[in-house]
């Protein structure tokens, strides 16, 4: 299994103090997981880095053909403070199922789960503790090859980021 390098942020963000007003996708953690794919090398260079913009060639296939897949899963705290992920193995299996449909190279599902666990560990202070809240994890993969003509993917990118999440349906709601 590949080693995941970690570069910790030198400028931590301020965490929201009112966990009842988090909303969906309004806050992002300090770090993100990245990994590249190149034909011949496979998936390589797994790393956790400070959250920030991703550079992308304007001719990247994901921009012209929508060659992108994503999954969503949650990390949450139990009453005794443990951190749990909700069925990450199934999420990674679904991600690979989507990859297959779009001819995106498969990921090692077990490695992807371990990478997410490591990222959750690095940013564990971002996991909200209020009832019904969680840390939403969004692994996604997109084709990065600069090619306007449609072809099989030779290069892809796997980032994962964490928007904080309040309950989507509030307790007592009729929706």
Question: Where are each of the predicted segments found?
Answer:
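Conserved alpha/beta cores of soluble small-molecule-handling proteins
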Residues: 1-175
């Amino acid at each position: 299994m590949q080693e995941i390098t970690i570069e910790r942020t030198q400028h931590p963000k301020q965490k929201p103090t009112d966990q009842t007003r988090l909303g969906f996708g309004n806050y992002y953690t300090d770090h993100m997981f990245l990994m590249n794919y190149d034909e011949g090398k496979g998936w390589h260079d797994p790393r956790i880095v400070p959250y920030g913009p991703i550079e992308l060639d304007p001719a990247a296939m994901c921009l012209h053909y929508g060659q992108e897949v994503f999954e969503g899963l949650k990390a949450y705290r139990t009453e005794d403070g443990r951190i749990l992920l909700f069925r990450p193995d199934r999420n990674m299996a679904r991600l690979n199922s989507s990859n297959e449909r779009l001819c995106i190279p498969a990921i090692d599902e077990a490695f992807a789960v371990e990478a997410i666990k490591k990222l959750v560990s690095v940013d564990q202070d971002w996991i909200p503790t209020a009832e019904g809240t969680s840390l939403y994890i969004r692994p996604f993969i997109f084709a990065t090859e600069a090619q306007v003509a449609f072809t099989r993917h030779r290069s892809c990118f796997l980032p994962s980021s964490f928007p904080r999440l309040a309950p989507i349906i509030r307790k007592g709601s009729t929706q």
